Amino acid sequence: ELENFFSEKPMDSLLYSIAINNMEKRNATVLKQFHELITENSFVLIGRCGNYIYKNDEDVTTLFIHSDMDSKIERTMHKQNMDRIKAKELIEYVDSKREAFHKRYTDETWGDARNYQLTVNSSVLGVEQTAEQIIAFIDKKHR
């Protein structure tokens, strides 16, 4: 199950249906194992419910970077060498999987600004300025 967590894949739906009553206990176990596994050193965690797992850790900065759909499509078309329709389909598919994964393990809404210390719209600032704003936020927070 920890392997499924790292790959952001929900458990088999049949197993999930059978074991629904034990969901909270299992989720707590997976999240605890994950927390113990990577708390030894400084690190950057992208996804995998990091905002939830580390929400009580003072040294942690949680952030969510989002973008408008047109910017996502343009970036995906360029990086994945695909047309607009396929890029949009891929984005919608990946985002729906991320949303379901986050909901499954945290019962929170993925991307909800209330669950992060900082949210940034990278389509407004661009990649470079987004990175600069994140660095400035972290520097200010940890002074």
Regions found by a protein language model. Give the residues of each.
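Long, contiguous binding/interaction regions
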Residues: E36, R48, Y52, F64, ...
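Short gly/ser/thr-rich secondary-structure transition/capping motifs
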Residues: E24-A28, F43-G47, E99-R104
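ATP-dependent small-molecule kinase phosphotransfer cores
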Residues: E1-S42
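NTP-dependent small-molecule kinase module
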Residues: H35, D107-R143
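Conserved phosphate-donor/acceptor-positioning beta-strand/loop module used by diverse small-molecule
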Residues: N56-Q80, R84-E92
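Short loop/helix-cap segments at secondary-structure boundaries that form the rim of catalytic
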Residues: Y52-E58, G111-A113
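Conserved phosphate/pyrophosphate-binding and hydrolysis machinery centered on Walker-type P-loop NTPases
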Residues: I20-N27, D95, T109, V124
